[in-house]
């Protein structure tokens, strides 16, 4: 059995196996649909209103992207014969799909974000990215590609704004915030610091702070950012002002922020809902 993975956003979620063909679409009431893909699943990114993008390995192509709605009905299919597509996302308005592509240029690998309108196979924009892409999502109407060197915010016309890590190493990120992204960087600015920051789509820091305690997980949703430290859970706003603190979190290993200000804490054997 391969590695199980989950992508969740806006009250919907997808559970799947990397390298497998089956996925399970969920909403707040439970299972919506069990789906079998035509190829091996590389990645799935859930977006707004239940729309999600699936990157597949298909015979005859390097990779393919399929887009579905919240009922599991197909909206769009794209097949790439020239470039490998690593991950993809659907725009917040449901009109565009962006796929992170990798190709070779002079012996080295380069990454780009290819944007398509869901009514056409014609390439709308091809934006060069800094670094290799780890994750994709949307923030405040823009696509966001999380790379090993920067956060790259890309508009539908291909315009790119970048937040550089300044030599820091990406530890964790959160893209669920409505108007911000969150990053945790280690060895920031060669000072050995752990740096927590919220960032807008212009690539500018909204707020930041130095972190001394170990961070187990972080998650953003709506106006809030949840950071699970080894000794406490802190819920911040986009300005990194503390909204609430929960001290007893010794059994928790993961956190899922919710847009209403509550958070789900998950451990090895149980999960609980924190209501500030």
Whereabouts are the PLM-identified features?
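Non-cytosolic head/periplasmic domains of membrane-anchored proteins
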Residues: 1-100
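A short beta-strand motif characteristic of beta-propeller blades
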Residues: 1-2, 29-36, 73-79, 120-128, ...
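Repeated scaffold domains used in trafficking and secretory/extracellular systems
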Residues: 2-11, 39-50, 82-92, 128-142, ...
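Residue position within the beta-strands of beta-propeller blades
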Residues: 15, 54-55, 98-100, 145, ...
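Short proline/glycine-enriched turn/loop motifs at strand-loop junctions of beta-rich domains
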Residues: 18-20, 148, 213, 230, ...
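Structural motif
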Residues: 21-25, 60-66, 105-115, 149-155, ...
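Solenoidal tandem-repeat scaffolds enriched in leucines and small polar residues
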Residues: 61-152
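Intrinsically disordered, low-complexity segments enriched in Gly and acidic/Ser/Thr residues
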Residues: 159-248
